[in-house]
Amino acid sequence: YWSLGDKGHYVKTKEGKTFHMPNSGAIFRCELDGTKVDRYSSGERNAQELAFDSFGNLFSMDNDGDYPGEKERALYITEGSEHGWRLNWQWLRKQDFTKISGISAYNPWMEEKLFLPDRDDFAAYITPTIGNFGPGPCGFTNNPGTALSKDLADCFFMTNQQNQIRVFKFLPKGASFKFEELKPIKGGIGNTGLAIGPDGALYSASWGSGKGFIFRFDTESEKDHHPARSETQKRLGLSSKEQTIETLALWLDSPDQRVRMKAQFELVRLGDL
């Protein structure tokens, strides 16, 4: 799965499909060999990174258009979902008519408050955000299950322009989700990408001040580590091709998403799943 920004796209696949949206971002996906390219969702503005929870639900944190009063959006992304943003709405305030007449052009995004969560009079043609936040999301990743500490096992992490790493939980709400924000982690300078290492620590890429950095974040003490963290690191270092079917089946019950996926992919390769 990967995201495209709102400058639009025109994609023709080898299977004969055409995906064309000149003024919208989108989420695409394909098989590992590059076949079966498919547009999974549309209407994102700048959803830079994607992350799945332990049940396969897909989320992203989308940047806003920098209008006064507008806010960034937390997105729950489902197959075929349309999230509403169009590139041309970015420039309505800069059009010649607006500049010459002094009369603001009608902007559905702001006038109809399409960036806010669902409500009684919300437009029915788009999938609304599950919550607002700000400002400047960039890196975004999930805890695969055993990283850091047990109380952060089902959390998501996001970098922003305030040099923080913000912490979120996505909680079921009807057929969708809501999000809850926890205490942020203080980051470095200009944090961008995020990744969970096989050692269970959280890593952040940083830029600025003429130098690049990699920051590592972890619990204050090893006694606070998730109890399955060391076992997860051990399993991640093993070759799945050298494991028995029984061992791979055991891995499917791991509390860590990476171990489960490792076992699943190998069992599929062997034709046993």
Briefly describe each language-model feature range.
Residues 1-247, 262, 266-269:
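Beta-propeller domains with acidic blade repeats across secreted/periplasmic ectodomains
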Residues 255-256, 272:
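Short inter-helical turns and helix N-cap capping residues of alpha-solenoid HEAT/ARM repeat scaffolds
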Residues 252-253, 268:
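Alpha-solenoid HEAT/Armadillo repeat architecture
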